[in-house]
Amino acid sequence: MRGFVVATIIVGAANCVMAFDFEQFFGGQNRQQQRTQQNNQPQDYEQQQLNSDCQKYLCPETFACVAKPVDCPCPFPQSQIKCVFPDKQNFVCISSPVDNVNGVPVRDCKWVEKAWKGLL
């Protein structure tokens, strides 16, 4: 009987610890998620745009202040390249090209230019 009581106490204590860790883990994550969601509200984006002191062109994705829209940087410069269209007025950011894999042509700025001209 004494062994049963000790085992019950140990199992009960383990359940309390597991319940505490479970609650702490998910409770903390939920609060973090709520903070993140609150910081990514459309009003925040709008306020950043409206409260900018940029006197030229404010890039919509990066909030960089540049002379003209084509001068905007890519939002992820470490993994994207900026390809300016032949009209020199517009651009697109694409994933940085990788080496030719299994004979598939590399998608780089030359590929974007061909697509712009309707050659693909």
Curated annotation (Swiss-Prot):
A biological process term (GO) from this entry: ERAD pathway
Source organism superkingdom: Eukaryota
Signal peptide: 1-19
Keywords for the protein's UniProt record, in alphabetical order: Signal
UniProt cross-references to CDD domains, sorted A to Z: LCL2-like
Coiled-coil intervals: none
Reported function: Probable component of the endoplasmic reticulum-associated degradation (ERAD) pathway.
Similarity comment: Belongs to the LCL2 family.
Descriptive protein name: Long chronological lifespan protein 2
